[in-house]
Design a protein with these regions (language model features):
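OB-fold/S1-family RNA-binding modules
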Residues: 81
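Short, small-residue-biased leader/transition segments that mark boundaries at the very start
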Residues: 2-7
């Protein structure tokens, strides 16, 4: 194998684990190693895709903070979520480090809070935070669940996992974000970002 193969593997590794396009991966590496690159103008389609990805990451970042706030500040979050984590031996520092949270057991609490905060419904749908129905109704995907954010290698929240707490629920015990422009389940390993910080 030549030196070019080594560079290709590095770029593809960054593409896969950072959820970046080829060009964004090159920019990432250039910035990391202080290499100046000359860029061409992006097409309108490329600009739109980049903008959508950035918007989805921004929405997920907001949602992670929202879920953590509900866990610590809402009575339901403290009574159900914090109790669940305590019963399973999660220490306070672990809960905070992994940015765990809680989604209220209400049909559209996250959706209403997100819209009120100025986030667009389309990105709440694209990230899988909400499920929209043809009749116009919207449900929070993770309601009534403890939340486990999934981080990319760079620390960006790309998805969520949620575990239902009610024992009598006739629903899936675990729910994950669907695959999206920013999340491909086969490319992510839960906790890898924090493992790399060690």
């Amino acid at each position: 194998r030549g030196l070019g193969d080594v560079y290709k593997r590095q770029v593809h590794f960054i593409m896969k684990h950072e959820q970046l396009s080829y060009y964004d991966a090159l920019r990432y590496l250039a910035k990391k190693y202080n290499i100046e690159i000359q860029e061409r103008e992006l097409s309108e389609r490329e600009k739109q895709v980049r903008s959508d990805r950035e918007s989805m990451l921004i929405v997920n970042n907001w949602a992670q903070k929202y879920f953590t706030t509900q866990l610590y500040e809402h009575q339901e979050g403290k009574a159900a979520g914090l109790r669940y984590f305590a019963e399973r031996g999660f220490r306070e520092d672990t809960i905070r480090k992994f940015q765990l949270g809680y989604s209220l057991d209400q049909r559209d609490a996250l959706y209403k809070a997100a819209i009120k905060s100025g986030y667009k419904k389309v990105f709440l749908e694209k990230t899988g935070l909400v499920i929209a129905y043809d009749n116009g109704g919207v449900n929070d995907r993770f309601r009534g669940r403890v939340i486990f954010p999934v981080h990319s290698l760079s620390g960006k929240v790309v998805a969520f996992g949620g575990r239902v707490l009610k024992k009598d629920e006739k629903t899936a015990k675990y729910v994950n974000s669907p695959e999206s422009e920013i999340y491909h389940k086969s490319n992510e390993l839960y906790g890898i970002y924090f493992a790399c910080l060690l």
